[in-house]
């Protein structure tokens, strides 16, 4: 494989670092470690990819980004669900609460910083939240109607003013 991108950018010298797997059963310790590592990567201006099992890993990733930057950032959330619950199954750091925790961050100015794509289901708590807050969303049905090109243009237009954007994909966006 040649060391270039499809835009003929030279990748020679590009380094990939695997920070390892996280196995700690203590969610608090796990979150602190992920947050610290992400913050360090962002401070070093490194591009990173986080691959995790449970979507709750988004919470410490966003906290790490937030602690490392000094400007507002956007979030593109591609998922079958909003993940906007204040609490789910007794936990505020559940996979269903990731974006609710995001809007509590210093550099996320409420739900308007988030663009939800592919949503096909919502919890009652999320519907109540949406009644009182502006939420950018293209549902799965609307995506089908608009088509990929129009969705991409809509999202680009809405998110263009952000210097930094975090993209998160939950596996159920594929079905």
Model regions: which residues?
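Conserved alpha-helical scaffold segments that buttress catalytic/binding sites
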Residues: 1-175
